[in-house]
């Protein structure tokens, strides 16, 4: 990553677009996780954690982002 940033021959607009997309993904992911942790204590208290399989949840999350 550091070598790519310092390279002079790269197209400036393409690099900026790539950086913006990456930062937006990271911030959205952090916000989504915080919101879910709060909701789990309230609405999903009766929902058994074992039945709500982590594999299915992670697959849906990967497709969305």
UniProtKB/Swiss-Prot annotation:
Disulfide bonds: none annotated. GO terms for cellular component: nucleosome; nucleus. Keywords: Chromosome, Developmental protein, Differentiation, DNA condensation, DNA-binding, Nucleosome core, Nucleus, Spermatogenesis. It is found in: Nucleus; Chromosome. One of its GO terms (molecular function) is DNA binding. Protamines substitute for histones in the chromatin of sperm during the haploid phase of spermatogenesis. They compact sperm DNA into a highly condensed, stable and inactive complex. Belongs to the protamine P1 family. This is Sperm protamine P1. It comes from Lagorchestes hirsutus (Rufous hare-wallaby). The gene is PRM1.
């Amino acid at each position: 990553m550091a070598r790519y940033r310092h390279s002079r021959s790269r197209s400036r607009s393409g690099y900026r677009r790539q950086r913006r997309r990456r930062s937006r993904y990271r911030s959205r992911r952090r916000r989504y996780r915080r919101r879910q942790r709060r909701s789990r204590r309230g609405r999903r208290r009766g929902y058994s954690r074992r039945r709500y399989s982590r594999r299915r949840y992670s697959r849906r999350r990967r497709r969305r982002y």
